[in-house]
Amino acid sequence: MLVFTDLIFLAIFAHIGKATAKVWNRNVQGFLDLNLPNECSQYTTIYSDGPSEYTSTLPYTHSFSNASVYTTLITITNSQCTGNYSTLTISSQPLIHTNTSISKPSQTATPQNTNTTQVSLTNGTTTNSYSNTNSLPITDTINGTTELIIPTTSYNNQSHTLIYSTYTSTYLPNSTIDLSILPHSTISTLSTVSINDTSASLSKTTSPTAGTITETIVSGSVGYTSTFPASGTTSGTVEVVEPTAGTITETIVSGSVGYTSTFPANGTTSGTVEVVEPTAGTITETIVSGSVGYTSTFPANGTTSGTVEVVEPTAGTITETIVSGSVGYTSTFPANGTTSGTVEVVEPTAGTVTETIVSGSVGYTSTFPASGTTSGTVEVVEPTAGTITETIVSGSKAFTSTFPANGTTSGTVEVVEPTAGTITKTIVSGSKTFTSTFPANGTTSGTVEVVEPTAGTITETIVSGSVGYTSTFPANGTTSGTVEVVEPTAGTITETIVSGSKTFTSTFPASGTTSGTVEVVEPTAGTITETIVSGSKAFTSTFPANGTTSGTVEVVEPTAGTITETIVSGSVGYTSTFPASGTTSGTVEVVEPTAGTVTETIVSGSVGYTSTFPASGTTSGTVEVVEPTAGTVTETIVSGSVGYTSTFPASGTTSGTVEVVEPTAGTITETIVSGSKAFTSTFPANGTTSGTVEVVEPTAGTITETIVSGSKTFTSTFPANGTTSGTVEVVEPTAGTITETIVSGSVGYTSTFPASGTTSGTVEVVEPTAGTVTETVISGSVSFMSTITAHDTSSGAVIVVEPTAGTVTETIVSGSIPFTSTIPAQGTTSGTVEVVEPTAGTVTETIISGSVGYTSTFPAQGTTSGTVEVVEPTAGTVTETIISGSVGYTSTFPAQGTTSGTVEIVAPTAGTVTETIVSGSIPFTSTIPAQGTTSGTVEVVEPTAGTVTETIISGSVGYTSTFPAQGTTSGTVEIVAPTAGTVTETIVSGSIPFTSTIPAQGTTSGTVEVVEPTAGTVTETIISGSVGYTSTFPAQGTTSGTVEVVEPTAGTVTETIVSGSIPFTSTIPAQGTTSGTVEIVVPTAGTVTSTTGSGTSWFTTTVPATGTRSGSVIVVSPTAPACSSTPFAECPNLNFNFHSKNVNFPPADIRVISVTPKGNNMYDATVQFTTSSTMSKKSLSELKILGLSQTYLLYSYNSKVDNISNPGSWTSTVTVQGTSTGSYICMPHFQIQYDWCSAGVTDMSECNTWSYQKSYDYITGCNNYDNQGNSQTDASDYCWNVC
């Protein structure tokens, strides 16, 4: 063994002598004096634990792989000595199995199972090796410590080289290898040499393979991001392996996976998203199947194919099954085409229906770009016979047709409810969507088929689901698509929820023909009890030119195994976009569990993948989650949600969101009635369309535990000279006893007029006006955003998140309403969104309805008006109520248009309100690119009477206006807080941003005012918040703005934190003028105890060419005098570049530019940082300020913090406690820490050329420097005069 180690040393030593040897060298002197007899005997070491301790990290310059050895060398030289040099060699080989040649090529090392360390000293031709007392190499395990005894005589006139050699394999456990070398001798002063090699920490996560796991949250959220700026290749794998053995209780399997790839030019990508369900054991109360989406876009001459398949368990007993769902078909032809579509749902035709969910949601969409005519009727026929108790019937259908020129289309969507037979608590069918668009001379065909189970007993199973297919051809193409759901054909069906949601959309941009049929066949035989079948799949493909695509989405229901009360699968999305002549293929497959015992378990998780390619590259990615493979898992919730965003830097843009709302557990006894309606019409030229979508709820009888109605969407687009009208009305039940009801929901209206058209639309939700309503949750939330600057069309999604479990108390009233209107030329639009809160009666523990969205777009000479109104229940007692929420208004005028809009929320004005959170946030956006005028008012009226206890008052309001040319706009956002009554423990109002942009010769003014409560008793109140004003003038414009927060002026205020932070930013690139005032008025009356006054304000303006600017930011703090002193450097003459040069990171200028006293010896200090050497923010993982009373995160990928725009130049305000040094106060030391090229960084182009370290700290201080003034810190301490 001694001979072997000698060979190791000789080989390494010989390697050192080569001129081409790549080693890591550092020459460090003067850190340790061993008090040896003469000057030349001073031992120079790079490591020490003495007063001048210096720690370094041994870097790895190679990737770890099997059968490799890597060596790190650190040379320590005493330059004051001459003569015969010796070498101290310390080599360490970790506990790794390998057979790697580590010396001469002819010599091969034996497999290592220990760390081997030896010391060799050479004087010319003589080499002495030192190890342990028996002359064998010293061994230890990873994380162990080796002690070497080195004779004193070995120190004289030696040059010492420390060599750290490492064997590696494909797997090295999580560890930090600490190698300690203690030079024992007769000399009185010794040192400890510590090598803390944190970069040697390699990790690989393996799932537990045995043991018992209880109440475990498995898996989770994984993100993979890769960015290639040019001709690159990337691959990523995220794997989810479900448990394959053992007993799992209360598990929900599968989850949500997203894959996104973007190629701006001539690229190819392929991606596979696969979820493997557990393959062994018995599964009880499991959620199987799920939701799959596939999207592919080809802008030129490409071909794509995609298959989305869900394989359900193929046999066994399934009980409590919900079948059927929603189906959508969309086809688009740009010119001179004809299309027809029929969406039909055939419900079961015989028997008695009990506890059925009736009706639902219907949508009709038609688009005519030129001289066309279309008509559409969507009719929901409620059940006409039998006994119906707690029934939710029907579902959601949408029909969309678009004709850009001289076409004709007609469509009928009919839902036939069950008229007879015995059906108990069953949800049948599922949801499918088919969309096809042909941009040029292409052909596509797609089939979406759901095959329900054909035999056996099914108990409490959720099967089927939702499938979507989308294909786009811009010219002269043909497409056909069939979406068919075949329900189980045998057995008895009990407790069935029938039908679901179907959507049909067809668009013809050019001389094409398309036909589509969406048919749902309900089950005609067999025994199905409370079963939810299948899941949701979506497929989207777009071809802008001469391409061909085909896609098949198939769901195979379970044919084997015993499954009881099982909800299978989850949600999967795949999106790929190709802007030029590429090819892509993708397969999304969900394999359901085929064996094993799984009981009420939620596994899986949430995965996101994002890739961006600005130029001709190739990428492939696989997202896979590996779940635990053995053990017992009880009551585990995993899963999650996924979001998708993709941007094309050239010739294309795409975006998308994948959201999964998992059930949250518990017992759900309330029934959800009805569903969602959508209406879309688009007329690009000289066309006319009309459509009516009406849902008639049951008007008589006894309905118990019912959730009524849902979400509606109306979209109309007129590119030229067309007219359209549409009404979407939901009539809630007007009679009977309703208990534990979730009422209504979310409504959206969208209209687009590119030229000289007129449209009107009304979306009204009438809440129940009579009866007793107890423990009611009212539907959900909608957000819609659309901007059309040319002859394009955009639409948004309506998402309703219903509660899934538990008993709901302490009610939240109303919700969120966005309004968007866009008029690109000579148009006029007006819109009103009003929410009327309950004004009287007895309402107990009620959560009232939801969210309404209105969108209108006018590209040319059009007019539109729309009203979205939500009428809350007007009678009853309201106790422990949280009152509504947020309203948004957006209007855009590209040319000579006028628009006005009012968004008003009227809170309850009478009755007893206890523990109420009032209102929320309201954004307003208006854009006028040329010669236009717009005005908007957003007002929130808080409750003005009654007793309010423990109330959180309103929230945030935003106003945005943009004027590209010669326009004028004004806007007022006002929040009126309650003016009477008793208010205790109240948080008042919130944050208000104001943004206005005028690129040419325009004028804009805006006022944002928050009026706090002016009377009553206020105790333990946090007042108001943050206000922002932003104005940008690209040319010859003028703007002024005032943001004022008026705090309460009367009453008793105790333990109050007043106001907050206000930013003001104005930019004038040419010959402009701007002025702005931000003022916070602190309460001037009452008792104020333990109060922190005001907050942070800043004013920034940039004038690149001869302009004028003025700005005032005034913060009036209660009773505290204003005091600010200019800070100065305590030791300005030291050399602060010395430390960064030696440690190899960029030099920087670090200053404290201002301080403001806060009282009690606390100060706000503003730090300014600049450096000439930096990478961009895309290469930054984290930036923070350390060493103060708290850590200040300026940027963090993992924590989602981004408070800087340029990593090389920024300012930040921190709070510090001053240190008194006589006549002035000094700031404590602090550090600035940079971490590059690690967490979240996917584009390594800058990292690969960066000449400095990837992680380093800047240090401040005046207490560590040598006789030449070379400082071991990077900036001076800063002090200021005592104020």
From Swiss-Prot:
Residues 1118-1283 form the Flo11 domain. Residues 107-132 have a biased composition (Low complexity). GO terms for cellular component: cell surface; cytoplasm. The keyword Repeat applies. Keywords: Glycoprotein, Repeat, Signal. The keyword Signal applies. Glycans are attached at residues 66, 84, 99, 115, 123, 143, 157, 174, 196, 266, 301, 336, 406, 441, 476, 546, 686, 721, 1203. Residues 211-1120 are annotated as: 26 X 35 AA approximate tandem repeats. Sequence repeats lie at residues 211-245, 246-280, 281-315, 316-350, 351-385, 386-420, 421-455, 456-490, 491-525, 526-560, 561-595, 596-630, 631-665, 666-700, 701-735, 736-770, 771-805, 806-840, 841-875, 876-910, 911-945, 946-980, 981-1015, 1016-1050, 1051-1085, 1086-1120. Pfam families: Flo11. One of its GO terms (biological process) is flocculation. InterPro entries: Flo11, S_pombe_Mam3/Map4. It is found in: Cell surface. May be involved in agglutination during conjugation or other aspects of colony formation. Induces flocculation when overexpressed. PANTHER family: M CELL-TYPE AGGLUTINATION PROTEIN MAM3-RELATED. Belongs to the mam3/map4 family. This is Putative cell agglutination protein pfl5. It comes from Schizosaccharomyces pombe (strain 972 / ATCC 24843) (Fission yeast). The gene is pfl5.
